[in-house]
A protein has these predicted regions:
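Acidic, small-residue rich beta-repeat scaffolds with periodic aromatic anchors
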Residues: 59-146
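Short, surface-exposed coil-to-beta transition loops
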Residues: 17, 27-31, 47-49, 65, ...
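Beta-propeller blade termini
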Residues: 3-12, 52-61
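Extracellular and analogous surface-interaction loops
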Residues: 9-14, 79-82
Length: 146
């Protein structure tokens, strides 16, 4: 039945240990990523109102495109910290107001950390962080249901 949760095991951070990604499908928790280390399961990343888009194992980065609702969408970059948890390092806020999402946003705001920045500085930061790594699509993983 369609009420079964989707999940997949994949090594998203290049440490040769698979993480578990689940898709509970709630508005506040669309997808979550769990790691297993020292016999402990830990939530390392979660997304509400959207889905994980790409992961960059070499640079331990996760990208989420178009997360949000009510006319405001964000693109997020998370980088894995020393604790294993992914921390938000950069984001773009796109305000559509009452426009449809296929038109251009009324206003776009760029952030590195929690500081506003220019589009050029944001792009430069992302480029430097990923160093040309192509990234892999979460959508092309072999999802299962249980």
């Amino acid at each position: 039945s369609s009420s079964k949760m989707r999940y997949v095991y994949v090594d998203i951070n290049g440490d040769h240990i698979d993480e578990l990604i689940t898709e509970p499908g709630y508005g506040y928790l669309t997808q979550a990523i769990y790691s297993y280390k020292n016999r402990t399961v830990k939530t390392v990343a979660a997304v509400g109102q959207g889905t994980f888009t790409k992961y960059y194992p070499k640079h331990k980065v996760i990208y989420i495109k178009n997360s949000g609702h009510m006319g405001y969408l964000c693109d997020y970059y998370y980088k894995q910290s020393k604790t294993g948890v992914y921390k938000l390092v950069a984001q773009v806020g796109k305000d559509y107001g009452s426009r449809s999402y296929d038109s251009k946003p009324i206003k776009t705001t760029y952030y590195i950390g929690n500081k506003k920045t220019s589009k050029a500085k944001y792009s430069q930061y992302i480029k430097k962080m990923l160093k040309g790594e192509k990234g892999k699509n979460f959508s092309s993983l072999k999802w299962k249901r249980y």
